[in-house]
A protein has these predicted regions:
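Outer-membrane beta-barrel "beta-signal"
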Residues: 313-317, 346, 352-353, 357-360, ...
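Transmembrane beta-barrel strands of outer-membrane/channel proteins
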Residues: 29-35, 70-74, 134-136, 186-190, ...
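Repeated loop/turn-to-beta-strand initiation elements of outer-membrane beta-barrel proteins
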Residues: 25, 64-68, 129-132, 181-184, ...
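Detector for outer-membrane/organellar transmembrane beta-barrel domains
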Residues: 231-330
Length: 384
């Protein structure tokens, strides 16, 4: 019932605008085929998964002050990997973490799944320096490229490389621009378990540094945080940190600090290098086995890593104007496990791309990256 009322509200709001006032409608998206070959650890049997994935992004601007947006993901997954991990893999794909369940099973069997997910459905209203967005949306408070302790609403999972748009939250976001480079944001969301996340953020600029401070609640925790983005002699320098303290045990807990610092630089020949570290005060200094499959986990800022300390590095280079090479890695110095992610991106035509990537996990059993084996991807993507 709540899903019906929410969708009805969005469309009734749009219907109040007269037809002659329609300003613009846009529709973009893509169609892709992604093949995954997985060599699990501790076995010689490889398995395979194929995905046909279509995305549509719709935007309607009936008048200058209103924007209605919808984003729809249509997925057809099939292959031996589906059958080998049925029904757990299917259940994970169909799980919607929003307050509204907008993930729909269209057809499934032990070896295939066809489903649709609406990850954007919102209305944005603008009045001079004030903006308000209501509905399923992406609230991005993160700064760093890999780990985002400030991103308490839609936490970025680095390993889920094929979902660049990121999941949305059923939320209300209000933003007031206090100046050319400053703003005040108030956001609140409910998840599938009716857990509330709400916070206030103030962003401003000092001496060419963008600074942000936030405070609020994330489910059962009080959270305060800050972040920055600037440069030191041409080197990009960013960071963010958040501190969490359980509200139910406020007096007898030490809380949890998660912080990440990053630096990046682009050379004149377009060689790009990026390095980052993350610290988790509640992380272990021993084997940091992740326990669940890294690609399907619903991470939050407290679970970006189970280790006390991780290091990230990346180097990318445009070999030609149409070919980009990239290699990245994450190292856990406590349990000596390693992730490596080499990739090649080919621009075949203006709207057609071929992407080849590996996600290679190394380490002893029960270490952070030691139990997943190697995954190889081939993706053909047409954008429109």
């Amino acid at each position: 019932m709540k899903k019906f009322l929410f969708v009805l509200f969005i469309f009734l709001a749009g219907s109040q605008v007269r037809a002659q006032e329609i300003h613009k409608f846009t529709a973009t998206g893509f169609l892709e085929y992604l093949n995954t070959t997985w060599a699990p650890e501790h076995t010689t049997r490889w398995t395979n998964l194929s995905v046909v994935y279509n995305r549509l992004d719709l935007h309607w601007y009936p008048v200058k002050s209103l924007e209605f947006s919808a984003g729809v993901r249509n997925n057809f997954n099939f292959g031996p990997m589906m059958a080998g991990y049925y029904p757990y893999y299917t259940d994970a794909l169909l799980k919607d973490y929003g307050w509204l369940n907008m993930t729909f099973n269209l057809a499934k069997d032990s070896s295939y799944l066809l489903y649709t997910n609406i990850d954007r459905l919102n209305m944005k209203w603008t009045l001079k320096k004030f903006e308000m967005t209501i509905g399923r949306q992406r609230i991005n408070w993160g700064i760093n490229l890999v780990w985002n302790p400030n991103d308490i609403f839609n936490t970025y999972n680095y390993f889920d490389f094929d979902y660049v748009e990121r999941p949305g939250s059923d939320a209300i976001l209000m933003q007031y621009y206090t100046g050319d480079f400053s703003s005040l944001q108030l956001a609140a969301k409910l998840d599938r378990d009716n857990q509330l996340t709400a916070a206030l953020m103030y962003k401003f600029n000092v001496n060419n540094y963008d600074l942000q401070f936030l405070g609020g609640v994330m489910e059962k925790d009080l959270v305060v945080g800050m972040g920055w983005a600037g440069q030191i002699k041409g080197v990009g320098f960013t960071g963010e940190a958040s501190y969490f303290r359980n509200l139910d045990r406020f007096a007898d807990t030490t809380g949890q600090l998660v912080a990440s610092v990053s630096a990046n630089f682009t050379f004149p020949n377009q060689l790009f290098v990026n390095g980052s570290v993350i610290y988790n005060s509640r992380g272990t200094t021993g084997p940091a086995g992740m326990g669940t499959f890294v690609l399907l986990g619903n991470v939050n800022p407290k679970t970006l890593t189970r280790s006390r300390f991780d290091m990230f590095g990346e180097v990318s280079y445009p070999v030609t104007p149409l070919i980009k090479a990239d290699v990245s890695g994450i190292f856990n110095p406590n349990d000596n496990s390693l992730f490596a992610g080499p990739s090649l991106d080919f621009s075949l035509t203006e709207n057609l791309d071929l992407y080849v990537m590996g996600q290679l996990f190394f380490g002893k059993p029960q270490t952070e990256f030691g139990d997943f084996g190697q995954m190889y991807y081939l993706r053909l993507k047409w954008s429109f």
